[in-house]
């Protein structure tokens, strides 16, 4: 599929009996596969998971990856896919992008689920810096170390398939460029926290207690939103849907179906 003139890859999980459409937005440097642990649990819904332009196996043009560029990408994607009033779930940068989109298209989403959303940090944390380093120098050792730090729990061990997939993707042409360009755009938009009060869409915010990539203290900013629930998952780091998918699903199912 072409979005904004660029080839975009996406995963679609259909359920003809469901009236709910979920759109999952991955984080910085990730792909649709980052949600793979959750796929079997979401079978009661229609689920659409794009590789954002510049990431995964979508095209990686040499453009400036601004927040506005990603918002236009999403709008075109929704129109081409004929998606209306979805529940959008965004992890980290994907969460920030969902919020930025909502500030422009205020009634487009039915509900929003945010997992450790970006948009509030003034500067990268040590763990985030290590993740960026692993993206720029994608060896098995660097990536495994960064992913394990992001989980920040001994109970979860990063699997080799995830590591190898990330290494392979970050070695694709222009992958490092899009990573850095997007990171710069994220840093310019850390004032998102001051506009959260403007978003009146029902929102669920989930954070891992052990998250040191975007520390759990940042959840306080999101309590300013008019219609919001906030939950903290114990024993999880930056990606609770990867680390404890069954427990995570129990948290989101009630919110989605209510």
Feature-to-residue mapping (PLM):
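Post-His helix in hydrolase/transferase enzymes
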Residues: 242-254
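Conserved alpha/beta-hydrolase catalytic His-Asp/Glu region
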Residues: 8, 123-125, 140-198
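Conserved HGGG/HGGXW glycine-rich cap/lid loop of the alpha/beta-hydrolase fold
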Residues: 12-57
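Conserved loop-alpha-helix segment in the C-terminal half of the alpha/beta-hydrolase fold
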Residues: 204-236, 242
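Conserved catalytic-core motifs of eukaryotic protein kinase domains, centered on the activation segment
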Residues: 34-36, 58-64, 123-125, 216-217
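Alpha/beta-hydrolase fold catalytic core
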Residues: 1-22, 43-46, 83-84, 256-258
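Active-site loop/oxyanion-hole signature of alpha/beta-hydrolase fold enzymes
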Residues: 11, 49-89, 93, 250
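Flexible "cap/lid" loop of the alpha/beta hydrolase fold
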Residues: 99, 103, 109-139
């Amino acid at each position: 599929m072409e979005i904004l003139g660029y080839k975009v890859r996406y995963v679609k999980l259909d359920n003809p009996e469901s009236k709910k459409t979920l759109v999952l937005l991955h984080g910085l440097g990730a792909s649709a596969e980052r949600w793979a642990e959750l796929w079997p649990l979401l079978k009661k819904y229609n689920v659409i998971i794009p590789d954002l332009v510049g990431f995964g196996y979508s095209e990686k043009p040499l453009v400036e990856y601004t927040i506005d560029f990603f918002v236009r990408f999403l709008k075109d994607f929704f129109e081409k896919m004929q998606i209306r009033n979805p529940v959008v779930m965004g992890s980290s940068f994907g969460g920030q992008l969902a919020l930025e989109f909502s500030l422009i298209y205020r009634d487009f989403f039915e509900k929003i689920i945010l997992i450790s959303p970006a948009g509030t940090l003034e500067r990268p944390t040590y763990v985030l810096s290590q993740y960026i380093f692993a993206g720029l120098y994608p060896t098995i050792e660097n990536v495994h170390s960064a992913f394990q730090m992001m989980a920040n729990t001994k109970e979860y061990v990063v699997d080799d398939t995830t590591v190898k997939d990330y290494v392979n993707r970050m070695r694709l042409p222009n992958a490092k460029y899009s990573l850095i360009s997007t990171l710069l755009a994220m840093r310019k938009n850390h004032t998102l926290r001051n506009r959260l009060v403007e978003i009146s869409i029902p929102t669920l915010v989930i954070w891992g207690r052990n998250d040191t990539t975007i520390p759990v203290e940042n959840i306080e900013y999101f309590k300013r939103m008019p219609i919001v629930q906030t939950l903290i998952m114990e024993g999880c780091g930056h990606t609770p849907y990867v680390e404890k998918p069954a427990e995570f699903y129990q948290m989101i199912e009630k919110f989605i179906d209510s």
